[in-house]
């Protein structure tokens, strides 16, 4: 059993050391259910990886997105780090009262050690032995402090991600089937049903998922969120991505080659609104626009809200592109 020590460790380049101050929160079980007498978890997608502790888990560190995914089960971490802190409300984790030990690719190892987490839950790398953006040095430093619990991100649909966080919550002794989470899950399922129903009624409607920027644009038909929309009956258009990426690059000169009845603009898109090519896209001229974001935290309420917004766009859309 690993015991955390307050080591004077620091993360050097390529990570910047950040100072984290403030009150140290206690991990909160919240909700119904009690902490499991010990912790055993075998994460999906990581064959042969099992995390075992011979004691209950009381203190959890997590990346912002995993903190959000677990918060819906009444789990509050003692420390958070990583990407997502500055996302809009409902898309990430509200870190009020929680120690922030790093943002983006920064991590303060010493500050993490002070919070004494029992486990650290975050998007896992290929082996599942560290955060997907850590280098070997940082991964080793963290491994000296705390057991890492990976969440597989690549090739996962939203349903897959929800299932992973539910499995971690169950391993922590949480009730994942009743109470508020059951209501939130039903709202998500109802929103997906609404999308499926409008997709069935408007089977000829085409949809393009795009992330715009001043120099280059990116589209996807194979990201997990895109797979969910395809499962629900949407006809996604756009270029095929390469074998090693879920994204396809599309220059502004080529954007008109992929017309769509409905255009979903990624929330991270920048410097595109005044581009004359954008203004001439059929969906833009028709005002048939919506949003999407593959970086949205995997919470049922957040996804339900977005899916209902999407359904409203689809319900008001017409087929404007000739086949």
Regions found by a protein language model. Give the residues of each.
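Extracytoplasmic substrate-binding proteins
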Residues: 140-211, 303-323
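Basic- and aromatic-lined ligand-binding clefts that recognize polyanionic substrates
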Residues: 59-73, 175-235
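Extracytoplasmic ligand-binding site segments that recognize negatively charged/polar headgroups
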Residues: 86-88, 126-137, 150-169, 204-227, ...
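N-terminal secretory signal peptides and thylakoid transit peptides that target proteins
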Residues: 1-12
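Bacterial lipoprotein signal-peptidase II cleavage site
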Residues: 20-32
């Amino acid at each position: 059993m690993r015991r955390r020590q307050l080591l004077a460790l620091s993360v050097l380049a390529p990570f910047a050391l950040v100072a984290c101050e403030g009150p140290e929160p206690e991990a909160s079980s919240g909700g119904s259910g009690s902490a499991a007498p010990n912790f055993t978890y075998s994460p999906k997608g990581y064959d042969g990886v099992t995390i075992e502790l011979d004691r209950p888990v009381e203190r959890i560190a997590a990346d912002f997105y995993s903190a959000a995914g677990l918060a819906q089960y009444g789990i509050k971490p003692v420390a958070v780090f990583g990407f997502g802190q500055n996302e809009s409300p409902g898309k990430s984790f509200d870190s009020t009262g929680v120690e922030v030990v790093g943002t983006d690719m920064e991590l303060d190892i010493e500050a993490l050690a002070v919070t004494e987490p029992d486990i650290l839950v975050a998007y896992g790398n290929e082996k599942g032995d560290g955060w997907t953006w850590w280098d070997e040095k940082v991964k080793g430093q963290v491994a000296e402090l705390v057991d890492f619990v990976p969440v597989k991100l690549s090739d996962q649909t939203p349903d897959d991600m929800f299932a992973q966080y539910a499995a971690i919550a169950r391993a922590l002794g949480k009730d994942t089937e009743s109470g508020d989470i059951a209501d939130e899950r039903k709202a998500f399922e109802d929103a997906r049903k609404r999308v499926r129903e409008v997709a069935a009624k408007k089977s000829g409607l085409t949809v393009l998922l795009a992330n715009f920027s001043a120099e280059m644009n990116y589209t996807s038909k194979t990201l997990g969120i895109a797979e969910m929309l395809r499962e629900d009956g949407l006809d996604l258009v756009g270029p095929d991505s390469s074998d090693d990426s879920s994204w396809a690059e599309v220059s502004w000169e080529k954007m008109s080659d992929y017309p769509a009845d409905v255009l979903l603009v990624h929330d991270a898109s920048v410097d595109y609104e005044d581009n004359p090519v954008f203004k001439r896209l059929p969906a833009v001229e028709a005002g048939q626009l919506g949003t999407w974001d593959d970086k949205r935290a995997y919470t049922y309420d957040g996804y339900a809200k977005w899916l209902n917004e999407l359904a409203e766009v689809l319900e008001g859309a017409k087929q404007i592109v000739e086949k």
